[in-house]
Amino acid sequence: MKKFIKILKVLSMAIVLSACNINGIFASNLNTTNEPQKTTVFNKNDNTWNAQYFRIPSLQTLADGTMLAFSDIRYNGAEDHAYIDIGAAKSTDNGQTWDYKTVMENDRIDSTFSRVMDSTTVVTDTGRIILIAGSWNKNGNWASSTTSLRSDWSVQMVYSDDNGETWSDKVDLTTNKARIKNQPSNTIGWLAGVGSGIVMSDGTIVMPIQIALRENNANNYYSSVIYSKDNGETWTMGNKVPDPKTSENMVIELDGALIMSSRNDGKNYRASYISYDMGSTWEVYDPLHNKISTGNGSGCQGSFIKVTAKDGHRLGFISAPKNTKGGYVRDNITVYMIDFDDLSKGIRELCSPYPEDGNSSGGGYSCLSFNDGKLSILYEANGNIEYKDLTDYYLSIENNKKLK
């Protein structure tokens, strides 16, 4: 699909009355009669791609207000090991209408298993939009199916220099070793961390990654990062975080340090780490580590962004499912907030944009975005990808005098 297909998406008329329950001091400052409407951006019931399932949301809000949403196009169902491309949806009217485009195709080697998936995106200081994804052509789990570097695996990058109108051909980041520095010799494979990356105050691009390593005759997987100082031409890999079974993650910058919020399989809470040396070393970040429950059962991806409020307070927002029902249900995608300039307030719940149960075949993922006072979320909803504008909830914080 090389041309945009203009399709009008009608906003859902149903307002989810229980969508966002305001916690404590936010309630008095929010017009709760104006609950955010949902927009189905990627819909398994339309014929844009004739796909049976959409997963893995990534969201960017550009400087001019243009929104770019990304998703796996899972043609034959929710499965990870299947035939998958990556699609983008672009809106210039605050989500009322969307244009669609396939931005990364798989290698077309195997009609059942060729896939590119788990996109992670960033917008650089030059306005370039970079997307990184994992690529495979055979069946098997990315982290456990082999004991050495997988022969069918690569990490691919595409980019756009015109606000997502056109996209480059795929750039292989792993075949050419000059493009990736410091990749460990015991690597099984790696892929991006899912969601979005950041641009630091000095212009350095940082992308979260998850990496599988062969250690002591066993495979382990960890969270980490890669970073670029030349607008994505070459990348340097950081080291793994201290704990295995961490994987999908996102990072923010605070006073030159990197703070990570990570999936943490089997531990029932999200993990968090801080690095003062661009990922060469990591240590536990106590204000967030093991503070957000992810229920019993599987861990899950979550989003993590930093916002500077009008009063100068630096706020962190994290979205993740509570998973109160355990397993892979991943119900109640909730947005949490922490004030990095007043950690005594702890972590507070802002809202639950998706209070329903997730689809255990694949659900619970989300991606937050913030630009020019607008807070947005893209999330998985039973095989679709939905969007909500959470700006009213953000304004409830801005208007709260206790924050100042």
Swiss-Prot record:
Record flagged with keyword Hydrolase: yes
Q: How is it modified after translation?
A: It is possible that the sialidase is cleaved in front of a cysteine within the leader peptide, forming a glyceride thioether bond which links the protein to the membrane. A second proteolytic cleavage releases the mature extracellular protein.
Q: Which residues form the signal peptide?
A: 1-27
Swiss-Prot/TrEMBL catalytic activity: Hydrolysis of alpha-(2->3)-, alpha-(2->6)-, alpha-(2->8)- glycosidic linkages of terminal sialic acid residues in oligosaccharides, glycoproteins, glycolipids, colominic acid and synthetic substrates
UniProt keywords, alphabetically: Glycosidase, Hydrolase, Repeat, Secreted, Signal
The record's Pfam families line, in alphabetical order, gives: BNR_3
Q: What does this protein do?
A: Sialidases have been suggested to be pathogenic factors in microbial infections.
User: What is the name listed in the Swiss-Prot or TrEMBL entry for this protein?
Assistant: Sialidase
